[in-house]
A protein has these predicted regions:
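An edge-strand/N-cap motif at the start of beta-rich repeat modules
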Residues: 1-30, 276, 280
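Short loop/turn segments that connect beta-strands within beta-propeller blades
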Residues: 23-27, 65-70, 108-112, 157-162, ...
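A short beta-strand motif characteristic of beta-propeller blades
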Residues: 27-35, 70-77, 113-121, 162-170, ...
């Protein structure tokens, strides 16, 4: 097993603009794939059989890679895609956040065919992370964009895209950057509040899946660098992981304890993190 991280580059990244691999102890293993179609990557998701890795590339395309890092599926260029996060839905389709269009689209797992809107364009001012529950309920983090546009909330939709709640949470100290669903069904959000402020408070926040009430807050001890938190992922060990500007942090989800920085790399500027089998696994 290995840890894979997308490192952002460009105007809003200043990272490495590639898909990086790390051993479970945090040792860098280099670039997972050197395919030139992977540029300034963002969202990541692993297929249910753990054989394919889906990657949202900054070249306006979606790719699927095998365990050797070879591209085995490619949508081709999708003009205007500007993909953010990506997640496989319970129905097997791959969901992608379109930042410019401010919506979520779906493509078939084989990456054939044109993307189909899951939600109307402009459904939120600036989409951040999202995730689907087992019943198809879709939770979409609505955050602040690079130009300061947006709002800080979570919108909820049923499996058909009908809005259930456009402001699911009431939290005056959150600015969502990614969203995940915990094993207990609650909603997890990485936050930097106020967004991009020099003195921003960074945290990971858990909300009750039924009421939207804040349950608890995860954060490392003071003095431990935790800047620009982004992608969230539950590992095979059940721990909660969050990739940030210079590291990947781990928390014991059962009791909330900070377990340490499992990856440390200056200018990582991580966007998404996943666990993916090695060829020898």
């Amino acid at each position: 097993m290995q840890i894979l991280v997308t490192s952002a580059s460009g105007a809003n990244g200043d990272g490495y603009g590639s898909l990086l691999s790390f051993s479970l102890d945090g040792t860098p293993r280099g670039t997972f794939s050197t395919d030139p179609r992977i540029t300034d990557p963002r969202g990541l998701s692993v297929s249910a059989d753990r054989r394919l890795l889906y990657v949202n590339s900054g070249s306006d395309r979606i790719l699927a890679l095998d365990a050797t890092g070879n591209v085995v599926r490619d949508t081709g260029e999708i003009p205007g895609l500007n993909a953010g996060g990506g997640n496989l839905a319970p129905n097997g389709r791959y969901l992608v956040g379109m930042r410019s269009a401010r919506t979520i689209v779906a493509v078939d797992a084989d990456l054939a065919g044109a993307p189909q809107n899951v939600l109307p364009a402009g459904i939120v001012p600036f989409p951040r992370g999202f995730a689907s529950a087992e019943d198809g309920t879709l939770y979409l983090a609505s955050g602040i964009g690079p130009e300061g546009e947006g709002e800080n909330s979570i919108a909820v939709f049923d499996a058909e895209g009908t809005p259930l709640a456009l402001r699911f949470i009431t939290d005056d100290a959150v600015s969502p950057l990614d969203l995940a669903i915990a094993p207990n069904g609650n909603i997890i959000v990485s936050s930097e509040f106020p967004f991009r402020a020099p003195d921003a408070v960074t945290s990971i926040r858990e909300y009750d899946r039924s009421t939207g009430s804040l349950v608890r807050v995860f954060a490392p001890p003071s003095g431990v660098g935790f800047h620009q938190p982004r992608g969230l992922r539950f590992g095979p060990d059940g721990h909660l992981y969050c990739v940030a500007r210079d590291n990947v942090m781990a928390f014991d989800f059962a009791d909330g304890r900070f377990l340490g920085s499992v990856v440390e790399m200056p200018r990582l500027n991580g966007q998404a993190v996943v666990f993916f089998p090695l060829r020898t696994d």
